[in-house]
């Protein structure tokens, strides 16, 4: 690709991106700058910059993006209550726009002509990275080595690494794993047969249900304008709050999901996901909305949710339709302030109490006891008017 003198690479320090780093430098005869993003994946990133430099990078950025990730990406998605195909809380999908954003910002600062990623040609991540770059910097070129090179197997990657002096880990991985503070995902290996039960190595953030405590635990989550702000009365930063709930939910085996989903590229794929803290936030937030948002606003928002979730899953975080939906959602969240009490037990979380200064719940209207506020006779006219359309349709 002519005209490329400098590339910024999303770099994890693993075999794939280390090979990509050297391959870019050799193939394009260009300078390579790396970005390693700390999104709370609980990996030891000490030395990853040194490894990048030894492998041929001219500069290596290692950045702590945890608070930005929680505040500007996880929380807006949680305010929407986004769930893909009714089950998936989008833990991998929501991380890609932030990484792409930083790639673009570093490319601008470094005067780079291109960015590069290590996503394969079969998955969703290639789409997510590249659509984000298209939105933020359409003039930048995007290099996707897995779509260009002739390295097609782990054996070939290892051979390339040995040829160029790249250190290789001898530990074989059972699964392809992706982790950040919101979730951990597992794919490949035995999971490629959808009949196989996930093995014990697929438990990282949450314990197996059989190992969860035999006694229930009660917790409270406070929200302000749709954002979680405190756990058990303790105010925490966005990232610290997610991590706190990961610890609580994980020890009760909460947030495990095993599903076959529809990738944007048209392939069905089986994934096992752990999202303990995100699951608790999602359940509590949805419950609090029940007393804070009026019916029509809630139903309008709910009608958009499949489209909103698909926008994130498919890589359209920076697209105008996602931003427009977010604006409507955030208006709906202005009243969502209050506290939800959850009961946690062996993989389950139930809301058992909720309160809000903005509650729309009226005890006098809801009670089964005698009530002067509501005249039961008024329902007859309401039902008659609602039935006009149906009676006319059936008669015709």
Curated annotation (Swiss-Prot):
It is an enzyme of class 6 (ligase). It catalyses: L-citrulline + L-aspartate + ATP = 2-(N(omega)-L-arginino)succinate + AMP + diphosphate + H(+). GO terms for cellular component: cytoplasm. GO terms for molecular function: argininosuccinate synthase activity; ATP binding. Keywords: Amino-acid biosynthesis, Arginine biosynthesis, ATP-binding, Cytoplasm, Ligase, Nucleotide-binding. Belongs to the argininosuccinate synthase family. Type 1 subfamily. This is Argininosuccinate synthase. It comes from Nitratidesulfovibrio vulgaris (strain DP4).
């Amino acid at each position: 690709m002519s005209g490329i003198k400098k590339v910024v690479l999303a770099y994890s320090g693993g075999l794939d991106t280390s090979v990509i780093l050297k391959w870019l430098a050799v193939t394009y005869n260009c300078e390579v700058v790396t970005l390693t993003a700390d999104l709370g994946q609980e990996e030891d990133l000490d030395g990853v910059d040194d490894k990048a430099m030894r492998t041929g990078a001219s500069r290596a950025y290692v950045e702590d993006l945890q608070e930005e990730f929680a505040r500007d990406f996880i929380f807006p998605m949680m305010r929407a209550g986004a769930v893909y195909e009714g089950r998936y809380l989008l833990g991998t999908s929501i991380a890609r726009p932030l990484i792409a954003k930083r790639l673009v910002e570093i490319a601008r600062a470094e005067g780079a002509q291109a960015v590069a990623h290590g996503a394969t040609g079969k998955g969703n991540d290639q789409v997510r990275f590249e659509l984000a770059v298209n939105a933020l910097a359409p003039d930048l070129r995007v290099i996707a080595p897995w779509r260009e090179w002739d390295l097609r197997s782990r054996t070939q990657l290892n051979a390339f690494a040995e040829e160029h002096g790249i250190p290789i880990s001898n530990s074989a991985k059972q699964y392809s794993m992706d982790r950040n503070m919101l979730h951990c995902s597992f794919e490949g290996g035995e999971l490629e047969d959808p009949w196989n039960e996930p093995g014990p190595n697929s438990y990282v953030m949450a314990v197996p249900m059989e190992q969860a405590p035999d006694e229930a635990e009660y917790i409270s989550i406070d929200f302000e304008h749709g954002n979680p702000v405190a756990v058990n009365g303790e105010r925490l930063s966005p990232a610290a709050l997610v991590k706190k709930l990961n610890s609580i939910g994980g020890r009760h085996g909460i947030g495990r999901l095993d599903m076959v989903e529809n990738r944007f590229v048209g392939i069905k794929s089986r994934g096992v996901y752990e999202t303990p803290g995100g699951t608790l936030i999602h359940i509590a937030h949805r419950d609090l909305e029940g007393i804070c948002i009026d019916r029509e606003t809630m139903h309008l928002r709910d009608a958009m949710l499949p489209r909103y979730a698909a926008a994130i899953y498919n890589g359209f975080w920076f697209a105008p339709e996602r931003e427009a939906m977010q604006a409507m959602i955030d208006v709906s969240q202005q009243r969502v302030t209050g506290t939800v009490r959850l009961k946690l037990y062996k993989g389950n979380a139930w809301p058992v109490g909720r309160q809000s200064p903005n509650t729309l719940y009226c005890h006098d209207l809801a009670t089964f006891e005698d009530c002067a506020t509501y005249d039961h006779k008024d329902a007859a006219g309401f039902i008659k008017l609602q039935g006009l359309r149906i009676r006319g349709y059936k008669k015709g």
